[in-house]
Regions:
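Conserved "landmark" site that anchors the functional core of diverse proteins
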Residues: 1-531
Length: 531
């Protein structure tokens, strides 16, 4: 057992088997509140633990975990779900050849053995299923596919799964199902959850119909039309603090990229700081106002251009309440520094939360969809008693293209997978933010790629916002709010939590200098075997 650093509020426990991982997960679930643990993300051989750093620390958690008996404990047994599969996958013949058996035997092994969901990750509703008897252990594809259809039934390593949505992927495809394993309109969007038992049946041999949970019809929004959107800019989304505690469904937190700016916008207006606002990327939002209201704009620096019904024009200040009247138009100019601005209204936007949040997750495609031209927005009741704030100001210095931004990082959990020279390059060389960057992550480019010391395949393990993942090309990807919950490339370090807002405001062609706050060091209790 090893205890590896992840961030100032997270550690990773590395174990020797999936059975140990599930045993530890089972024990941690019983100690979440007592040990001040906020969330756990189990994976194939690791458990990522996010904790409250004010109430506990990594060393204390490591010592507590060392007292646990991991010889007992298993995946809780859940409901049985039957999935009908058409076994016509593109990789079926490869799987048979790799295992030295016939295609028919592959299908028999997959259908004659019950699977159980060990954990969820990669994408919402993506379940990693295991079977003690199926004997279908195959490697991932060397070259991942750009697009795998939703419903594809696949194998990789010791796991089987069903792709919940169309997405890239590197698993071996053996079939496809019509079952909707992820649908946000169901009461429980994810068909599978940890503990679920799964029985695959061959659709070609069965005429029986299997009924899955009913899908609710979407409710139409008949709200009033307080604001009409005339232009959206590059991207405008609803965002709040995000989805906390949804890791069991394979969903990361998402939420506003610059939470300090979101909170300031709401404090300016007397709203609760988590009230949903518009996150506008690179400016360009233009709206028509259809009633009197109070707004505020914070975050990335831009002009707030207002034209009244009578044609008068003026520029309003950021970080201040702005009174608007019916007939006004508001247009945000091009961004001068930073990337994302936040527009809030007093009382808040009328938006229905999805899985506890009004944020749109661009990777998971969960939440109210992106704002479109012609869309109308409604405001909730403005009958709030809190006073406005006139003393708000930016919490960070917003960088401009070409600037060098210094980000503090914690080294780990897989720093020791890289050569000493790669670790040196990570912190000494400048990394340019490329145009391929988005809310999922900043794709960086450096003069010299980072090289690995350990070349074996890394079993999927949990990730966090700020994680610096190093894919095969050696050029880092800095994970931001919409990052995948688990990943299969090693994480060399992570941006400290207090610099995450700044990370979300770094523009294209700015450069990043990573500043380690300490050396890579495992926590006390590492390498103690309890089983």
């Amino acid at each position: 057992m090893r205890f590896l650093p992840v961030n100032i509020d997270a550690i990773m426990v590395e174990l020797s088997s999936l059975e140990q991982t599930m045993a530890l997960t089972d024990q941690l679930q019983n100690n979440l509140a007592f040990w001040k643990i906020e969330e756990i993300i189990p994976a194939a051989r690791t458990v990522l633990i996010r904790f409250n750093p004010i109430l506990t620390d990594a060393d204390t958690l490591a010592k507590n975990i060392c007292t646990l008996d991991l010889t007992s404990g298993s995946i809780p047994s859940g409901e049985l779900i039957i999935i009908s599969v058409n076994y016509n996958g593109e990789d079926l013949a490869y799987v048979a050849d790799h295992l030295g058996i016939t295609v028919s035997e592959v299908i028999n092994r997959h259908t004659n053995n019950e699977y159980q969901v060990a954990f969820c990750g990669f994408a919402p509703g993506f379940a990693y299923m295991v079977s003690n008897h199926a004997q279908l252990n195959v490697p991932r594809r060397q070259s991942p596919r750009v697009r795998i259809p939703a419903g594809s039934v696949a194998l990789a390593g010791e796991f089987s799964s069903v792709y919940p949505q169309a997405s890239p992927g590197g698993w071996q495809l053996i079939g496809i199902t019509e079952s909707a394993v992820w649908d946000i309109n169901r009461d429980n969007p994810a068909l599978f959850k940890p503990g679920s038992r799964v029985h695959f049946v061959d659709a070609a041999k069965s005429s029986k119909k299997y009924h899955l949970p009913m899908i609710k019809k979407e409710e139409k929004n008949n709200s009033q039309q307080d604001i009409k959107v005339l232009a959206t800019g590059l991207q405008t989304l609803f965002q709040d603090n995000g989805r906390i505690g949804q890791a069991a469904l394979g969903i990361s937190e998402s939420g506003a990229m610059d939470k300090s700016a979101l909170h300031s916008a709401n404090r300016v207006l007397g709203n609760p700081i988590n009230e949903v606002a518009l996150e506008i990327t690179q400016g360009g939002l233009k709206t028509q106002i259809n009633r009197s209201m109070l707004i505020a704009v914070t975050g990335a620096v831009c002009d707030i251009n207002i034209t009244t019904l009578l044609g008068e024009k003026y520029t309003a200040p950021m970080y201040q309440p702005i009174l608007l009247e019916k007939g006004d138009t508001v247009e945000l100019g091009n961004i001068k520094c930073g990337v994302r601005s936040y527009l809030a209204v007093r009382g808040g936007f009328q938006v229905s939360p999805i899985l506890t949040s009004c944020s749109f997750d661009t990777l998971a495609q969960v939440g109210p969809p992106p704002i479109t031209i012609g869309q109308t927005l409604a405001i909730k009741s403005t009958n709030i008693k809190a006073s406005v704030s006139l003393n708000e100001s930016p919490a960070i210095n917003y960088p401009c293209p070409g600037d060098v931004v210094v980000l503090d990082i914690v080294l780990g959990p897989r720093t020791d997978w890289f050569t000493p020279n790669a670790i040196k390059l990570l912190t000494e060389q400048l990394w340019r933010v490329t145009p391929a960057s988005n809310r999922i992550g900043l794709r960086l480019s450096g003069d010299i790629s980072l090289t690995r010391d350990k070349l074996q395949e890394l079993p999927s393990e949990g990730t966090c916002s700020g994680a610096i993942q190093i894919p095969a090309n050696g050029q880092p990807v800095l994970f931001l709010n919409d990052h995948p919950l688990t990943g299969g490339y090693p994480i060399i370090g992570a941006v400290c939590k207090y610099h995450l807002d700044l990370s979300g405001q770094i523009p294209i062609n700015a450069k990043i200098k990573f500043n380690p706050v300490g050396i890579f060091k495992e926590f006390e209790g590492s390498h103690i075997d309890h089983v």
